[in-house]
Amino acid sequence: MAVEFDLRQKSTRELNAALHRLNGSGDTGTWRIRNPHGLHTLAVGVDAPLTIDIEGHVGYYCAGMNKYARITIHGNAGPGVAENMMSGVVRVTGSASQYAGATAHGGLLVIEGDASSRCGISMKGVDIVVQGVVGHMSAFMAQSGRLVVCGNAGDALGDSLYEARVYVRGTVASLGADCVEKPMKDKHKQELEGLMNEAGITGADAAEFRRFGSARTLYNFNVDNADAY
Amino acid sequence: MPTDRKRRKSDRQNVAELRTRLRESASFPRQVIAEIQRAARTGIYDIRGFGAKRRIPTFDDLLFLGASMSRYPLEGYREKCATNVTLGTRYANNPIELKIPVTVAGMSFGALSAPAKEALGRGATIAGTSTTTGDGGMTPEEREHSKILVYQLLPSRYGMNPDDLRRADAIEVVVGQGAKPGGGGMLLGQKISARVAKMRDLPAGIDQRSACRHPDWTGPDDLKIKIQELREITEWEKPIYVKIGAARTYYDTALAVKAGADVVVLDGMQGGTAATQDVFIEHVGIPTMPALRQAVEALQELDMHRKVQLIVSGGIRTGADVAKALAMGADAVSIGVAALIALGDNAPELEDDYNEIGSSAGYYDDWHEGRDPTGISTQDDALAARFDPVLGGRRLANYLRVLTLETQTLARANGKSHVHSLEPEDLVALTIEAAAMAKVPLAGTDWIPGHAKF
């Protein structure tokens, strides 16, 4: 039996407090949250392997800093969905605004629609799979983890990125500083297939993707790179 | 034939004459010439630690009036002068209670060694005040040894996680710092050890340049929601500070209040840094004294003075600095460079070691190089092992107590039974610049430049 929570009757604070009471408990229950109506900071700081279904659009920072929970947003997500996620799975059935998965350290973020600019900015180990397109400056300063884009990528993809790996099936408007295309080896195809399986994305063949990563030329100060600074 | 003695005498005369005829350029003094030569040799800007070294108007340009016929002083040892501070009374369910009006500013593990961070926690805890993490996450050492620990949320989000958020006593959203308003963090490869790299999720040995803007909010409207998220994650328990570098301070303070800050932390241009371009340190931002006045004016205009608390930092060295900052309207001050000096930085006993790395006690500012002979600003295990965190903590506690005693001395002299009762009317300025910046009258006059009388 799912726990029903109606945000027309109770507040964001009451929702988060109720979820946090289960933090560290290992509870695997199911929660159905109705009428989110674009509210901000829903289901943030959850630390239990709950299954949470949010039935509608959400505002800023939904599922922020998530640990263990499987959170599905049945709608669109505002800025910073799953920001700084540590683990678990966050799925957006619609599209996501800016900075989706920003600085996230782990877990899996799936966006079934499109993601706006700065998707995966400063990502630190999270895996992000976007079925549609991503906007400009995606994977900016991305440190580690994988970003998979089934559609096209906007300008300055992977600017100043570190060790994150970026896979794009469509076109790339432009690459950011120090981001270069790298060969797709078998191990990368396997990694990509694994990620798409995990994300439940079908209809995209790993062979159609290109791989991008850091040229590592900006890792240490070098006068000869002054034009890139 | 001149004798040897005569020749030596005439050489000395020539040298002496030459010296008096040598004229150093005001525009191109030796330090400027040396910097041009260094730039031409290396092709890269100068990076260093410490804070601004140029001469600027400071709290030294202000004086307390004291008490006499028109005001009563308090007895030095018999009448109590309280120093406690409460931070976070606006929204936080668990405000911070400090025994003294001096806190320890954010300095990262990475910039500092683990035992140095531990010492900061030990010293602050003995003295009854808080210490702060930095751009690199929270170490178990500093959490264990800090009774009150402020956890910084920085643009890089290195090491940021919800467990440490919950473990923190307060959260500080860092928008900027006084040494470099508008600049991000910097940690050069020499200090990216395996442990630092792991905490920050970076490859070891790279020159880390942190982002200067937050990744998931832009502007005060977004920040308001970001702060709401932090409060939701931590059950509205913890005070949320917003730290700004002194720039357009009046507006920045007002916007921090609008964004929902419990506490505004204002860092003036003298504020320290572990590693920043010298040109940034010396040429961006405004001094602590005028910035403080602007921040207090913004709070007063919003009727938020003493409701949103104000912590000011940047060049605080003595109890006189503390008392003057409080008199101008701050609720507390914060120390960074002075705390490191209390731990042992720039110790004259280590002159030979400083000479070996091309510096000298009293001048050492190459904190970014990680070769600190005191073991404070390094990630070299052998150097760090030289530093005794227990002794360092004791020295910091001593220094914090001296600052507090000096502050009380000045407060009593002005007839105040709480350091927060100090007020701008207790101050005068020694220079026209300081009078204009602090908006207190030039000593012996009722003149505040730029202030028309009604």
Q: How does the language model describe each region?
A:
Chain A
Residues H20-T30, H40-L50, Y61-A69, G80-S87, ...:
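Beta-strand repeat architectures
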Residues R34-P36, D53-H57, G64-M65, H74-N76, ...:
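Feature marks extracellular polysaccharide-active and adherence modules
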